[in-house]
């Protein structure tokens, strides 16, 4: 019985090695001419790169420019936030209240009516707080 188990174990191991070997990718050796002609990347196509050392003044100027850009972005975002919102319609539904199809629109301009469970439970929800 032990010889039979040993034979089965060696058969199993050999099958494992055969399956692993069959899944390995085969690489065919290519000559240098075919590699040169088939290569899609040509080193002459790329421009040369020059490395320039920065002095302290240029570093300070670039920091100042970066701060100016940051401040201008903050000012622009402040302008976008300050825009007036349209007034809500007179008969409107508050946020998180029921808004079935015969009900009027939501009061918040950023909110929309979302329905669940085959339109049996509908509520006004704000989708994006940055509206």
Curated annotation (Swiss-Prot):
SUPFAM superfamilies: Agouti-related protein (SSF57055). It comes from the Eukaryota. Residues 92-131 form the Agouti domain. Disulfide bonds join 92-107, 99-113, 106-124, 110-131, 115-122. Its main location: secreted. Glycans are attached at residue 38. It holds the Pfam family Agouti. The keyword Glycosyltransferase does not apply. Residues 1-22 form the signal peptide. Changing residue 96 to C: In strain: Black German Shepherd. Keywords: Disulfide bond, Glycoprotein, Knottin, Secreted, Signal. InterPro entries: Agouti, Agouti_dom, Agouti_dom_sf. One of its GO terms (molecular function) is neuropeptide hormone activity. GO terms for biological process: hormone-mediated signaling pathway; melanin biosynthetic process; melanosome organization. It is found in: Secreted. Residues 57-93 are annotated as: Disordered. Gene3D superfamilies: Agouti domain. Involved in the regulation of melanogenesis. The binding of ASP to MC1R precludes alpha-MSH initiated signaling and thus blocks production of cAMP, leading to a down-regulation of eumelanogenesis (brown/black pigment) and thus increasing synthesis of pheomelanin (yellow/red pigment). The presence of a 'disulfide through disulfide knot' structurally defines this protein as a knottin. This is Agouti-signaling protein. It comes from Canis lupus familiaris (Dog). The lineage of its organism: Eukaryota, Metazoa, Chordata, Craniata, Vertebrata.
